[in-house]
Amino acid sequence: MTKELCMRCYISGRVQGVWFRASAKNLAEQLMISGWARNLADGRVEVFACGKEDKLEEFYTWLQKGPLNARVDVCTRENLPWEDYITFDVL
């Protein structure tokens, strides 16, 4: 059985105004990942995501590239204990 866990990621580069959060939500829903994504005042996007470990790995790989018009310079990740979220929200 695949382990469930959460992760918090900070993504910097050209990641605001390029549909990064909406695209992340679409993929998260396809992968059955819950959590949220929000813009930060410093220009980064913060993502908190919970799901099965293999699905989170796939999601993290995507976060390192982002949608077509994005340019990801840095994507940091911190693994966290499981939290039971139901949906993936854009904040």
Swiss-Prot record:
Question: What UniProt keywords apply to this chain's record, in alphabetical order?
Answer: Hydrolase
The question of whether Hydrolase is a record keyword is answered with yes
**InterPro entries hit by this protein:** Acylphosphatase, Acylphosphatase-like_dom, Acylphosphatase-like_dom_sf, Acylphosphatase_CS
Pfam families, from UniProt?
Acylphosphatase
For whether the record's keyword set contains Iron, the answer is no
- Indicate the enzyme's highest-level EC class: hydrolase
Q: Which PROSITE patterns does this chain map to?
A: ACYLPHOSPHATASE_1 (PS00150), ACYLPHOSPHATASE_2 (PS00151), ACYLPHOSPHATASE_3 (PS51160)
Residues forming the Acylphosphatase-like domain are: 6-91
Substrates-to-products reaction catalysed: an acyl phosphate + H2O = a carboxylate + phosphate + H(+)
Enzyme Commission number, as recorded: 3.6.1.7
Catalytic residues as annotated in Swiss-Prot or TrEMBL: 21, 39
Listed GO MF terms: acylphosphatase activity
The family note in this entry says:
Belongs to the acylphosphatase family.
The identity of this protein, by name, is Acylphosphatase
The source organism is Legionella pneumophila (strain Lens)
Lineage runs: Bacteria, Pseudomonadati, Pseudomonadota, Gammaproteobacteria, Legionellales
